[in-house]
A protein has these predicted regions:
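Glycine-centered flexibility sites
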Residues: 66, 107-110, 236-237, 270
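Secondary-structure edge/capping motif, primarily at the C-terminal ends of alpha-helices
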Residues: 31-34
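Active-site diphosphate/adenylate-binding microenvironment
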Residues: 38, 50-104, 111-119, 124-125, ...
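Active-site glycine/GP-rich loop and adjacent strand/helix microenvironment
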Residues: 2-28, 38-50, 142-144, 151, ...
Length: 306
């Protein structure tokens, strides 16, 4: 891919970049297997130093805070990059011609859209698949998907679409993309439910919160049954695309309309600017795998600071 007017980068060290990607993937694998791995801090610090040398604009944050990258020892010492920066400039070490994906934000703030360029999507896939299997479907490795979103091929700049498309591939079930021309296709959903029931496959329905509002409106009070092991993943806000519904009320309406327990409605937190996702612990609690709770759980390769 190329991008008109892209900023010229300093010489990009591809082998060093790839070595960092491989370390991240190894860290993910070791964490999921419960094996000893290098520390989060040492990996994060090495990534920060590499990014500093790339002259992406991140180095200005260090200079503004008078931080010497050579003295970094903890991830908490690395300055956070404001999301607005992704709207104002390209944030990537690699040159634009090495982009394999360019994920764009929704542009709900001031109409500007941030961009997250990706060179090696395998690292993104590794973390996404690992944590989804832990939080969304720890009880099965195969399930069918009903996606309240347009097909990823029609929205190639959507990080959510990329994630959903990849999780469908990882779980080897059938995928039904149930949004056509901006409209929720209830008939397609009904057919997908029938087929999954005939094959005795568990189902997950996934999409943004506003898409579930559209689904509820399209149902007009009718109910659908996701089945005994059915679950829902909802994410994001309403982004001005539907009426706003209070979170608890929406959860209850979804559960009632799809005939599933409220703990089977799992909220996901993700951002285009991030490569990792956090999930509520409701479903794992309902399955008896841990104490039920409503907190968002981050993967070991993601750190939240306040």
């Amino acid at each position: 891919m190329t991008s008109p007017g892209s900023r010229a980068h300093c010489p990009f060290d591809l082998p060093a970049s790839q070595a960092l990607h491989e370390r991240v993937r190894r860290f993910i694998d070791h964490q999921m297997a419960g094996r000893q791995s290098e520390s989060f801090d040492s990996l994060a610090v090495d990534i920060a130093r590499f990014q500093f040398q790339c002259e992406t604009g991140v180095e200005k944050l260090y200079k503004a805070k008078n931080i010497d990258t050579g003295s970094l020892t903890l991830a908490s010492q690395i300055p956070a990059v404001p999301t607005d920066v992704f709207k104002l400039r390209r944030v990537a070490c690699h040159p634009a011609e090495l982009d394999t994906y360019r994920f764009l934000t929704s542009g709900t703030t001031l109409g500007a859209r941030g961009m997250h360029p990706v060179r090696d999507a395998d690292t993104y896939r590794r973390g996404t698949r690992a944590w989804a299997s832990q939080m969304l479907y720890p009880d099965t490795d195969r399930l069918d998907w009903i996606l309240l979103a347009p097909p990823f091929a029609d929205s190639p700049h959507s990080s959510l679409g990329f994630m959903l498309d990849d999780l469908c591939a990882a779980t080897q079930g059938q995928a039904t993309w149930a949004v056509l021309d901006g409209r929720v296709d209830v008939d397609a959903i009904s057919r997908a439910l029938y087929c999954a029931n005939q094959r005795q496959m568990p189902i997950i329905m996934a999409g943004a919160s506003f898409a579930f509002v559209h689904l509820l409106e399209a149902l007009q009070g009718r109910n659908l049954a996701l089945g005994q092991r059915g679950r829902v993943m909802q994410t994001g806000g309403f982004k001005g695309k539907s009426k706003e519904v209070e979170a608890l009320a929406l959860r209850e309406q979804i559960a009632r309309s799809l005939k599933i327990p409220t703990d089977a409605v799992i909220s996901e937190y993700g951002m285009t600017e991030l490569g990792s996702q956090a999930y509520e612990g409701r479903w794992r609690g309902w399955l008896g795998l841990e104490q039920p709770h409503e907190d968002f759980v981050c993967p070991p390769w993601m750190r939240v600071t306040t």
